[in-house]
Amino acid sequence: MPGLIGKKIGMTSIFSVEGKNLPCTVMEVGPCVVTQVKTVDKDGYEAVQVGFEDKKEKHTTKPERGHFKRAGVSFKRYLAEFKEQGKYKEGDVITVDFFNKGIYVDVVGISKGKGFQGVVKRHGFRGVGEATLGQSDRQRHPGSIGACSYPAKVFKGTRMAGQMGNTKVTIQNLEVIELISKYNLLIVKGSVPGSKGSILIVKK
C-alpha cells in the first residue's frame, strides 16, 4: 500500500533537536477504508481502492451506493487507487500509523488557482523595462513571441499570459517530522500544494 488520502490543515513551525526552526505542514491523513480490491483475474492488474471522509447517502449516486454496500463500508467522499499486491481486504481500516517518523514521503495535490496572469507573475519575465526610444507602457509586456514571415507561426509551448495554478503538483521527499496518531495528524517538513482543507495524496 504505497499511500493514503489526506487533507491539508495548515502550516506551522517546529524546533528541531539542534535548535533549528523548521517550517512544517500539518495534514490529517486517514483513516482510510479499503472499498475495493482489484485482482489480475478479474481486473487485469492488482490494486487497492481506498475511501476517505464519510458523506450522507443523499449526496451519493446510485452506482456509488451499490459500490460501497458491496464492500460493506460507509459512503465515502473521496476515493483513490494504489497499486498493491493482495495484502488488504475490503473493509480494512488504514490509519496514519501506516507511516513512520523520519521517512520521506511524496505529496500530490492541486495547487492554488491564481486565475489569468501575465508573463511577469506566471513565468518570471523581467518585462520590457526601461522606457527606451519608442517604448511606452510596456513594463510588464512579454516582448517578441516569434519571427515574422518565417516561421510565420507561434511555436507551441511559447511562454505567454494565461491560466496560472489549479494544476496537479507533486512535491517529493518531504521528511515526516511527527506523527500524532490520536488525531490522525502527519507533520512533514516544508510546504505542500493547495490551500487549507484541500485534498492530498500522501505516498511512501
From Swiss-Prot:
Coiled coil: none annotated. Keywords: Ribonucleoprotein, Ribosomal protein, RNA-binding, rRNA-binding. GO terms for molecular function: rRNA binding; structural constituent of ribosome. GO terms for biological process: translation. The keyword Plastid does not apply. Pfam families: Ribosomal_L3. GO terms for cellular component: cytosolic large ribosomal subunit. InterPro entries: Ribosomal_uL3 (IPR000597), Ribosomal_uL3_bac/org-type (IPR019927), Ribosomal_uL3_CS (IPR019926), Transl_B-barrel_sf (IPR009000). NCBIfam families: L3_bact (TIGR03625). Part of the 50S ribosomal subunit. Forms a cluster with proteins L14 and L19. One of the primary rRNA binding proteins, it binds directly near the 3'-end of the 23S rRNA, where it nucleates assembly of the 50S subunit. HAMAP family: Ribosomal_uL3_B. Belongs to the universal ribosomal protein uL3 family. This is Large ribosomal subunit protein uL3.
